[in-house]
C-alpha cells in the first residue's frame, strides 16, 4: 500500500442526563458559538453563522421551536481544530517514513436548562480530514448527525 494514507474514522458520542424529562423541552435558543482554530476558513464569523443556522434547522426538524422569549434549552457549541504533522511507516521494503498531515476537528454541542450549568444533553463529534478546507465542508454535516441523535421523548 505504498502512498496510501490512513486516518481514523470519525468519532461521535452523545451523553444525556438520565433524570431530564426531554418531553418538557419545546423551545431553544442558540447562543454564540466558541471557535478555537488556526484555520481561517473555520475561525470566522461567516462560518459561525453557517453552523448556527445548521444547528437551528436540525433542532426545528426534531420538533423544537426557536424561542422568542425564555427558552426551555440554551444551545451552545464549540469547535476546536488542530493541524497535525506526523509520519507514517513506509508502505514497502526500503521505503522510509512518509509525512502525514491532517486537521483534527472537535465539535461539541451542549443543551442546558436556563439557570443550570450542567448540560442535559451533550454531543461530541471528532472529525479528521486531510485539509482544513475539507473540515470546513464537513462540520455542518457533523452537527446534523449529532442533532439527529437528540430524542425529544
Question: Predicted regions span which residues?
Answer:
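C-terminal/domain-edge helix-coil "capping" segments
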Residues: 9-23, 102-106, 113-153
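Short beta-strand
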Residues: 66-68
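Sec-dependent N-terminal signal peptides
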Residues: 1-3
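Surface-exposed beta-strand edges and their flanking turn/coil or helix-capping segments
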Residues: 27-29, 42-45, 74, 88-90, ...
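A structural "domain/chain start" motif
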Residues: 5-57, 61, 70-71, 83-85, ...
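Surface-exposed short loop/turn segments
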Residues: 12, 62, 71-120, 126
Amino acid at each position: 500500500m505504498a502512498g496510501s494514507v490512513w486516518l481514523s474514522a470519525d468519532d461521535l458520542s452523545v451523553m444525556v442526563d438520565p433524570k431530564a424529562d426531554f418531553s418538557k423541552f419545546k423551545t431553544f435558543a442558540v447562543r454564540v458559538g466558541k471557535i478555537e482554530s488556526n484555520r481561517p476558513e473555520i475561525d470566522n464569523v461567516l462560518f459561525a453563522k453557517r453552523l448556527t443556522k445548521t444547528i437551528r434547522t436540525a433542532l426545528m426538524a426534531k420538533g423544537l421551536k426557536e424561542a422568542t422569549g425564555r427558552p426551555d434549552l440554551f444551545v451552545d457549541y464549540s469547535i476546536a481544530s488542530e493541524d497535525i504533522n506526523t509520519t507514517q511507516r513506509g508502505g514497502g521494503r526500503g521505503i522510509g517514513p512518509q509525512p502525514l498531515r491532517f486537521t483534527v476537528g472537535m465539535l461539541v454541542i451542549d443543551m442546558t436548562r436556563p439557570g443550570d450549568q450542567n448540560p442535559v444533553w451533550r454531543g461530541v463529534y471528532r472529525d479528521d480530514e486531510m485539509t482544513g478546507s475539507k473540515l470546513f465542508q464537513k462540520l455542518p454535516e457533523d452537527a446534523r448527525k449529532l442533532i439527529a441523535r437528540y430524542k425529544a421523548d
